Amino acid sequence: MPRPIRCRRVEFLPRFNYFSPREGSNDEVQLKVEELEAIRLKDLEGLMQEECAQKMQVSRQTFQLILEEARKKVADALVNGKAIRIEGGNYVFGNCKYTCLNCGKVFELDKDECPECHSSQVVCHRGKGRGHCFRHHRGW
């Protein structure tokens, strides 16, 4: 069984989530929310890859893979006249606290297991302005 994908932290949700050529086909590419965040941090903010990875709470390698996939999708849309729809992915907006369903421990790191009892039953804790992990979420 493959490892579950951890939620990537994003700090920005765009005002508009659909962009299309003035004239064009009905084809579109789906840009995940975390892919847009990678482009924003690296290309717009001009941060170093290490800083981007830290902000998104992923490894440098994972950040690089997210960024490459995002750039491919944007290039495909621009070169081939496709629309871009921004939605979905595995992300948490802002900071999130996690709760172990086994022992009740609350912690801030996005981990596959509880640091206290090592249970894999860990969920994003909703409460007081904390984020919620969106997994393959349509729209926002």
Swiss-Prot record:
<dbReference type="Pfam" id="PF02001">
    <property type="entry name" value="DUF134"/>
</dbReference>
<dbReference type="InterPro" id="IPR002852">
    <property type="entry name" value="UPF0251"/>
</dbReference>
<dbReference type="InterPro" id="IPR013324">
    <property type="entry name" value="RNA_pol_sigma_r3/r4-like"/>
</dbReference>
<dbReference type="InterPro" id="IPR036388">
    <property type="entry name" value="WH-like_DNA-bd_sf"/>
</dbReference>
<protein>
    <recommendedName>
        <fullName>UPF0251 protein Athe_2281</fullName>
    </recommendedName>
</protein>
<comment type="similarity">
    <text>Belongs to the UPF0251 family.</text>
</comment>
